[in-house]
């Protein structure tokens, strides 16, 4: 191989490595977002359950008052 071809190959390899590093960083960011969204989802589910219990209790009280 000529030096020119080796230089082009080296450039392409360097570009590929940089792209891989950027993709790894993006993947890590997305993983962190996913973890945050999972935590938020869990909190919202707990809030929903709490509200459902409160509403069920209030409906029960209303039913007792009606009867």
From Swiss-Prot:
Disulfide bonds: none annotated. Residues 3-59 form a coiled coil. GO terms for biological process: division septum assembly; FtsZ-dependent cytokinesis. Its main location: cytoplasm. Keywords: Cell cycle, Cell division, Coiled coil, Cytoplasm, Septation. Pfam families: ZapB. It comes from the Bacteria. The keyword Membrane does not apply. Gene3D superfamilies: 1.20.5.340. It is found in: Cytoplasm. The keyword Cell cycle applies. One of its GO terms (cellular component) is cytoplasm. Belongs to the ZapB family. Homodimer. The ends of the coiled-coil dimer bind to each other, forming polymers. Interacts with FtsZ. Non-essential, abundant cell division factor that is required for proper Z-ring formation. It is recruited early to the divisome by direct interaction with FtsZ, stimulating Z-ring assembly and thereby promoting cell division earlier in the cell cycle. Its recruitment to the Z-ring requires functional FtsA or ZipA. This is Cell division protein ZapB. The gene is zapB.
